[in-house]
Amino acid sequence: MKHSKKIAALIILLLMCAVLINPERYLSSVKDGVILFWAAVLPALFPFFFFTRMLTGLGFPETIGKFFEKPIKFLFHTPPISAYIFFMSVLSGYPIGAKLISEFYKNGVINTEESKKIIAFSSTSAPLFVIGTLGVFMLDNVSYGVIILFSHYLSAIITGLVFCNVRRLNATKSDVKPRVKPLPDNVIGDSINDSVLSVLSVGGLIAIFSLVIDVLYDLKFFDLFGNYSPLAVGFFEMTRGAKEIIKNPPSTGALLAALTGFTSFGGLCIFLQATTFLKEAKVRSSYYFLVKVFQGLVGAGIAYLVSLPLP
């Protein structure tokens, strides 16, 4: 067994022991994660999983791809269909971009190299979360939500420009324009089945991370980071990290930078959600992690600069 696998096995055993020692506490943590998934994530995510699956089968990605073919090739050197993946990611949020990449890879529309480039700019949060949850609900300031959203999407584009051009020499060229495979006769039924399985995998990770974070809190793990503990929490789960930093907010610039960093990186929970799909396109987790760290840092920097004129 490799050293990293031994560490992972040890962590899993410790988590199991924690549940056995205090089952009431940690089963409640899992329950909280399930409730969060059921009440907030499932209603927001399932329709988009379903509709994107339907649009794919109806040939809509090709229509969008043809319309944006020249700018998408000029900026990112990726196939036209990546425009559809980008717009769906912007509209629907995590982890739609990764899921669509997985689907198109399995259909033979894109290859692994193209998947790596597309995920660099197609891994984003949804406006509903940024403006609604962060801006209105948590910060009680829509303009702050707009700054975070602008910085977040700009960081995705910059990340795409950097990583796509770095990988440009590895791009594969083909004169054949692949087509999306049509869905079978039972379009609605198959779309629902696929969407249910995908969204349940997301729900499972949310429930597990609710448990993990509560265990880490009880072990005083986050106290090791002192004043930077909200950043450590946000590394694991962006929403809880946002709640922690808003409790004792720093300067406006630092606050918006941190929240944009959380949103752009996505947290380890969302990272693992995306990798469950990206592994089917043979995109390595280490590469995707580098992409998200870069995007998080760029997003934080942009938000800080934009917020400098603010009091």
Predicted regions mapped to residue ranges:
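Structural signal for alpha-helical transmembrane segments and their membrane-water exit/capping regions
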Residues: 7-26, 49-59, 164-166, 210-222, ...
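Alpha-helical transmembrane segments in multi-pass membrane proteins
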Residues: 39, 44, 48, 52, ...
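Intrinsically disordered, low-complexity non-transmembrane regions of multi-pass membrane transporters
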Residues: 1, 168-193
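Membrane-core helix-loop-helix motifs of multi-pass transport proteins
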Residues: 104, 109-165, 277-301
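Final/C-terminal transmembrane alpha-helix of multipass membrane proteins
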Residues: 11-18, 289-307
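Alpha-helical membrane segments and immediately flanking helix-loop junctions
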Residues: 75-139, 232-249, 255-278
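Transmembrane helical segments that form the transport core of multi-pass membrane transport proteins
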Residues: 188, 192-263
